Amino acid sequence: MRWLLPLFRTVTLAVVRVRRGVCGLGMFYAVRRGRRTGVFLSWSECKAQVDRFPAARFKKFATEDEAWAFVRSSSSPDGSKGQESAHVQKLQVKTSKRPREPLGEEEEPPEPGAKHTRQDTEPAALVSKDAFSYMGESVVVYTDGCCSSNGRKRARAGIGVYWGPGHPLNVGIRLPGRQTNQRAEIHAACKAITQAKAQNISKLVLYTDSMFTINGITNWVQGWKKNGWRTSTGKDVINKEDFMELDELTQGMDIQWMHIPGHSGFVGNEEADRLAREGAKQSEG
């Protein structure tokens, strides 16, 4: 978990937990002294570490930053401000070097004559569970997408998925089909979930710097489906096939979507970005 520590500096973070049919409250259970120390996503996970453990120290927090501060410190920071029922928890964004990403429904214009190409899925050998990094019982993964000359004829897009240092599932590949940044972000998440399913992983903490992807899958997609895959203004959803694929992949998964600022020095995000850029250099298969 050492390589995850830079994450726990004061950063902008939006946390969304989605499980089909269940909306999580996003509370964080910090264990400073117990069978295992760290931050857990449910009381049952926390209880297993502290129940009947001598002089156990643990506390519930509304934010991940506070929880990790409690784990690392010798004295407790201010505790939880109480449960929040909001679907998405947001802390104020301070800086991000990436240009502003459209946050409205489908702001990206379609590329004329472009076709959607579904990614092929390939069988994968099972990887030891010890090779993954965990937050509670959930496996941690970082995804990123990139596109040079976005929206132009010579655009080149790639996707990156980063599971940890030297991990065999780390991948950077060229995005098939229409070459845009938003499609790359969506399909990076698709790739990570596909890999997770192949490893029999059902609980994920998925870090992405794309609020467009997070909003799309946790917010907009349900409304689009009810509206015949049209936006609230009656327009066709530009990335319909991409979100349909992502929506299908999330079925049966317990995914906590976490937003992290892009290009701000966080190792997991920087590595996913590097893999995406390497993927964009590949020829389109």
Curated annotation (Swiss-Prot):
In the presence of magnesium, manganese is inhibitory. Its cofactor is Mg(2+). GO terms for biological process: DNA replication, removal of RNA primer; mitochondrial DNA replication. Binds 1 Mg(2+) ion per subunit. May bind a second metal ion at a regulatory site, or after substrate binding. It is found in: Cytoplasm. One of its GO terms (cellular component) is mitochondrion. Residues 72-122 are annotated as: Disordered. Keywords: Cytoplasm, Endonuclease, Hydrolase, Magnesium, Metal-binding, Nuclease. Its main location: cytoplasm. Its EC number is 3.1.26.4. Residues 135-281 form the RNase H type-1 domain. Mg(2+) 1 binds at D144, E185, D209. Mg(2+) 2 binds at D144, D273. It comes from the Eukaryota. Pfam families: Cauli_VI, RNase_H. It catalyses: Endonucleolytic cleavage to 5'-phosphomonoester. CDD domains: RNase_HI_eukaryote_like. GO terms for molecular function: identical protein binding; magnesium ion binding; nucleic acid binding; RNA-DNA hybrid ribonuclease activity. Monomer. Belongs to the RNase H family. Endonuclease that specifically degrades the RNA of RNA-DNA hybrids. Plays a role in RNA polymerase II (RNAp II) transcription termination by degrading R-loop RNA-DNA hybrid formation at G-rich pause sites located downstream of the poly(A) site and behind the elongating RNAp II. This is Ribonuclease H1.
